């Protein structure tokens, strides 16, 4: 049985990052709403509890409180931002509204050599004080310590930026250790989880495979399972895991909507039929999808049409498999949290996935989601352990609607063909171009990244078709052809992203090859927008 951390979510946009940092320490954790019952907290039996941040005000909103069981269990508790404030209020301290709100980078002084912060510092002042570079995001602040607590940290704007009751192993910080902007944040969370809470770092994928396989066999028995295979990481890993558990009881349906990447259908069939010997039904529905997309320019309408048509095609194939009793999906933990699947009232539905919808209810099937407890990086690790090739497991993310949302405006087959070829050239050049010492000296990459491909050094890269024409010259003739934009970003969590500073020589090769090899395109531009203000995808 694994040690578990319970994360109570008060509505922060970055609660998932807390869970990711805990999982990176190889400790299992789950996110649940702050208003779970005392009985739930006791039955969960956590080794420790973490209270998240929130957009709410402790001073004004008396409803967002941690269950009493949090304080009765006798386990270590870490409060983060709002979590610190509710800890203070519930344990007899004082919180006040501040006329000096603090958002962004801050330098914080550690006090008292607490177990949480001892020997963790970014630099020292001339007076010898240990300082930390942290990320603040709060309006209210603690102005009075609860009984038994001592000061742990402070900033000029926030005299009580951290507090601790080391007898009860209660710690609280006003900053966000889970975000990358807090330089030593990961180290702090690891210390809380591994040393203060005493969790064993035994959450590893090899063990998880055995547990997941056993659970799938127990759930499914001798019944059959159908899975929509997209070629993306999540559905591919789910298919490989389920196939390992039940073999030919699984049938995969691969729908080609005409908006896939270059040779994607071929690669999927080679992998799952050729190497894993799985049963795969390949449906070419490109005419159906493209026909319904004709004349549609609104991005959200395009997504809805693609989602609707996918459901229709998948339903038609599923009904042919009369023995199927289960629908498998590659749902991962962020999907569960974002869709409110953790039953938290605080979670806002951010997106709906085009291949989920109401399929299980419509088809009368039971739902099998073997990846629903895993983050994306854990899914990739699982895929490698299952024997999937790294080039498939570590492919950049690809949207469910495919090229349909990378073609601005109306989707046409000719546009998709042009974009597919341009995108393939861009990805090929990224894969074969290796970062050099010159790149590191120019500040384009870190010294330790020298020798890696630029594909591996970017988090997501793709081409976008722009439905505008520009004048060009090729040979002795004038051209009037379409424009393609290249987009490459670097990010740790996809919540924020920087545009990738690719070498000019690499961009030049991409431009030359695209213009010379893809007839119909005569201009290539590079997107230098970060997120925010832009999103990663254009639509």
Swiss-Prot record:
Enzyme class: ligase
Pfam families with a match to the protein in the record: GATase, GMP_synt_C, NAD_synthase
Lineage top rank: taxon: Bacteria
Enzyme Commission number(s) of this protein: 6.3.5.2
GO CC terms of this entry: cytosol
Keyword Amino-acid biosynthesis annotated: no
Gene Ontology MF, one: GMP synthase activity
Reaction(s) the record says it catalyses: XMP + L-glutamine + ATP + H2O = GMP + L-glutamate + AMP + diphosphate + 2 H(+)
Record has Transferase as a keyword: no
Listed pathway(s): Purine metabolism; GMP biosynthesis; GMP from XMP (L-Gln route): step 1/1
UniProt: ATP binding residues: 230-236
CDD domains attached to this UniProt entry: GATase1_GMP_Synthase (cd01742), GMP_synthase_C (cd01997)
Subunit structure: Homodimer.
Function: Catalyzes the synthesis of GMP from XMP.
HAMAP family named among the record's database cross-references: GMP_synthase
Record protein name field: GMP synthase [glutamine-hydrolyzing]
